[in-house]
Amino acid sequence: MWYPGDEDEEFTSIIENIEKKETQEIKIKTEKLRQASLNQLPIEQSEGVGGGELSEYNNNTTNNNTPTNTTTTTNTNTTTMNNSNNNNERILSTSNGFDIRLPPNSIEQPSPSFISSSQDGVLTVDPLAVDGEKGNKESQSPPNGDNQILNNNNMFFKDITSLPSTDNKSSTNTNNNNNENPLKQTISSSPSKSTTTTTTSTSTTTTPSLSSLSSNNNNNSNSNNNYINHSSISTVSEGLENLNLKSGIKKIDSETEKYIEEGKQVFVNFLKGHTCYDVIPISGKVVVLDTKLAVKSAFYALEENGIKSAPLWNSEQHDFTGMITVSDFIDILLYYYKKPKSNNIFQDMGIHRIETFWREISVERPSSLISTEPETNLYDAASLLLCYKIHRLPVVDKKDTNSILHILTHSRILAFMMKSFPQLPEKLLSIPIGSLGIGTFATVVTVMTHTPLVEVLELLSEKKISAVPIIDSETSKIVDVYSKSDVTLMSKQGILSPSDLNLPVHQVLSTFTKLWQRPEQIYTCTRFDKLGDVIERCIKKRVHRLVCIDSSKKVEGILSLSDILNYLLNDVKSINH
């Protein structure tokens, strides 16, 4: 079993901060509810209730939606509510048996947050009221050992841990925004009932859109069928062999090639001797989305949880049916850019559910979930990643619970290999990547700072690449990298019009950095860097790729973890051959 390192400790710290903030917000809401009930009571009744204190108690409950073989208990502070009266009045039961009648809410209640505060377990987002459906409709959840089901306005959160969880982060009043990150406020301005909103009695705060922050935005019209010009997209044409000849990097001799073969065989034997179960951390989180969820809600769920993909659960088939990734959302954005139904792409995305939207766009998708099992050795699991050209491979416990235990990645496999190897093949790891011929050098695609964002999105979709370097048109030096992970940052906006996608890509990323502290994306290496140093840098920075540059910071190539893993598991591919 591999024990998690700094990455899990950092995530735990983030979750603890969220829990503290949510606990404070719940206390504030409870006090406001108590004050509201006092204002509705007659004076004599208020005195009889003992100052109008509402009863709060610890209640050990077993959720009715939990599988019959599972018993999960949680301690929660609750206030008894009864909404069955004919006048739509809210009736609160007090500790002395009195009923407090409150007028019906005139303000629409916000949807719950997508994120559960629990760190450990499987989080399933399952919509029961995406289209305003009410009632006691039972949801079929993915089978787990222990399921904790929290019923809220629009969806269920199913968490396999028995830890108490709060998930009303998004339902707090913005009067308390002085102690809250303003970026966690209103996500969408759509009037739909399933829209996540934040309400206030005085004013409504909306995160500014890209167009409102642009000083040079002249694309105010709705560009339905804009012709996409690729004139600002270029390709690095000089191959690695020519670059090595110019810089004096030596070719691999027969003795070095022997060390390479021996080192690669050591790595292969190590991976064949360990299973996926060995890589699964002690604690972790897997987010699962129901196929009935609205596309917009799925988009928000990925951003809220800081992930790039999630398995899809079909409640009718009682099985996992695939993955939804940021690549899918790129195709969705491009679809609504060309065929907008309104001036807000996010509003358009709320129309379709995940299960029906793929019929609207002609995108090739796997017919079933590509997965592996805990008993599969890491060599076979890595081969699946490389064969299907995917970045994430779910590890499914098909024998017992049919639940997803972990999402395996190139980074996780390489990190486990580097940390757990008893004796690393240092001779192989000390060879420069330029000599090994790892990476893409002859066909590196780059864009300019003024390239429209929509052209970059089309490039990522057409070329099936995960990132593209951004080059300054004056200096020809790299200034940034646009990756697929940047796509989810768009969900932080309240409105995204089709014309916003016409903005220059560098301007968009600068806005993201100013508003939402977008993490640094430029991680580089050179052809002279050793293979071991490159692997360590990717793992430490938690990035999938490095941009290979020369001494003047001009792009020469791209080196990804997929390239490294493919090189280690296959025949020698030096530039001599």
Curated annotation (Swiss-Prot):
Keywords: CBS domain, Fatty acid biosynthesis, Fatty acid metabolism, Lipid biosynthesis, Lipid metabolism, Repeat. GO terms for biological process: cellular response to glucose starvation; fatty acid biosynthetic process; positive regulation of gluconeogenesis; regulation of carbon utilization; regulation of glycolytic process. GO terms for cellular component: cytoplasm; nucleotide-activated protein kinase complex; nucleus. Residues 106-121, 138-155 have a biased composition (Polar residues). GO terms for molecular function: AMP binding; protein kinase binding; protein kinase regulator activity. Residues 45-226 are annotated as: Disordered. Coiled coil: none annotated. PANTHER family: AMP-ACTIVATED PROTEIN KINASE, GAMMA REGULATORY SUBUNIT, LD22662P. This is 5'-AMP-activated protein kinase subunit gamma. It comes from Dictyostelium discoideum (Social amoeba).
